């Protein structure tokens, strides 16, 4: 087995699709028919993607629903679970869960036994590495406040925060080497503000002065935007803290990090005005500590194709709608001539535009497989021949 394919895909509200599949006959039966077309198309896209290990964002809530969904969407794959019907051991809120699927034929051929890292282990490692700043999976973060009486932003306050969706880490031994794949879904949850004092006042034009005026006229919205970025940035920092702890345990751990990393609207504006870091920067680490720096699987993918979603940024209309939200990163132990037994070679990463568009060309936009395109990387087993 000279190589295997690792992929990440946000399948967009799989839990809702599963619920629609269970709609009975009657006036709403059209929902079931649409869901059947959608999940069959998702199955076709997963089949064409042909990943050996697939990380899924926005999967169904809980093991029982996930098993039911993937039995239809990903036949031939095994869902890696914690054998926890309560779901508590996943540390995930909401209905958008994170799942790893391993192709059955790959598991057998590679002779691996994949499992999920206990959250207790993750939390113990981050607590140690952070010198106690993180404890029991929670940490302090300074969040801005908004005074509804005055309509002005107030002083920041320290609050305890934790992962909304705790990262799930797939672990297995490959020819004597421990491999870890950290799956994440970081996403701001503030955009649909119903409070009139926290609404966004759209700019009169894309000119910077008009955008600046809109930001000044929307203090409640901007407060929520900065608050959301602070939360997700702290979650990214916790992921990086876990990775740093692994480097404190061995000189060159073999770690992948992949998933949907969404900074939210107004990414560059929020960073420039409020001096916050982008999430990928937090995750990659400090380039001055090069051995710990994470490489990006898409760094040499053509610029014009290096995007996975199309969104109009309501805060910054100057921003190009083609945005890379889905990422695959990996440690230095997986690249270069010294990498063994697995190596990520140049040109191995890809956004799967062709497969995604081919499958969705047969569907109405209302039931497209997803608003995200899958991303993937081919990992070469250099122990079986020339690297």
Regions found by a protein language model. Name each.
Residues 62, 108-111, 120-122, 145-148, ...:
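Metal-dependent phosphoester-hydrolase catalytic domains
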Residues 1-99, 210-217, 231, 236, ...:
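N-terminal, active-site-proximal structural segment of metallo-dependent hydrolase catalytic domains
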Residues 21-25, 70-73, 197-198, 270-278:
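Short secondary-structure boundary/capping segments
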Residues 59-194:
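Structured beta-strand-rich core segments of catalytic domains in phosphoester-bond hydrolases
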Residues 27-36, 224, 228, 297-298, ...:
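A short acidic, glycine-rich active-site loop
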């Amino acid at each position: 087995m000279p190589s295997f394919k690792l992929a990440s895909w946000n399948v967009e509200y799989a839990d809702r699709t599963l619920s629609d599949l269970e709609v009975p006959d009657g006036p709403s039966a059209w929902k079931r028919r649409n869901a059947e077309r959608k999940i069959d198309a998702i199955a076709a896209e997963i089949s064409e993607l042909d990943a050996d290990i697939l990380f899924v964002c926005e999967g169904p809530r809980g093991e029982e629903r996930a098993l039911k969904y993937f039995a239809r969407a990903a036949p031939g794959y095994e869902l890696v679970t914690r054998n926890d019907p309560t779901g508590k051991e996943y540390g995930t809120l909401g209905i958008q869960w994170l799942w790893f699927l391993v192709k059955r034929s790959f598991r057998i051929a590679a002779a691996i036994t994949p499992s999920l890292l206990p959250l207790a282990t993750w939390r113990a490692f981050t607590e140690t590495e952070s010198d106690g700043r993180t404890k029991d999976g929670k940490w302090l973060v300074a969040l801005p406040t908004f005074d509804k009486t005055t309509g002005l932003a107030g002083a920041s306050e320290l609050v305890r925060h934790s992962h909304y969706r705790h990262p799930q880490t797939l672990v297995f031994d490959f020819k004597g080497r421990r491999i870890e794949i950290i799956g994440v879904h970081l996403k701001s949850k503030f955009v649909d503000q119903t409070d009139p004092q926290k609404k966004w006042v759209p700019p009169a034009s894309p000119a910077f002065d008009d955008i600046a005026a809109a930001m000044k006229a929307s203090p409640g919205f901007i407060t929520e935007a900065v608050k959301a970025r602070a939360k997700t940035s702290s979650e990214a920092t916790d992921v990086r803290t876990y990775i740093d702890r692994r480097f404190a345990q061995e000189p060159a751990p073999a770690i992948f990090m992949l998933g949907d990393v969404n900074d939210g609207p107004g990414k560059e504006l929020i960073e420039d005005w409020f001096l916050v870091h982008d999430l990928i920067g937090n995750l990659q680490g400090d380039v001055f500590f090069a051995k710990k720096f994470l490489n990006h699987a898409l760094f040499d993918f053509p610029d014009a194709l290096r995007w996975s979603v199309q969104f109009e940024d309501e805060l910054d209309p100057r921003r190009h709608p083609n945005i890379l939200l889905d990422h695959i990163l990996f440690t230095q132990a997986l690249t270069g001539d010294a990498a063994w037994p697995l190596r990520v070679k140049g040109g191995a990463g890809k956004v799967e535009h062709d497969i995604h568009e081919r499958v969705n060309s047969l569907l109405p936009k209302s039931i497209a497989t997803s608003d995200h395109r899958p991303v993937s990387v081919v990992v070469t087993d250099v122990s079986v021949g020339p690297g």
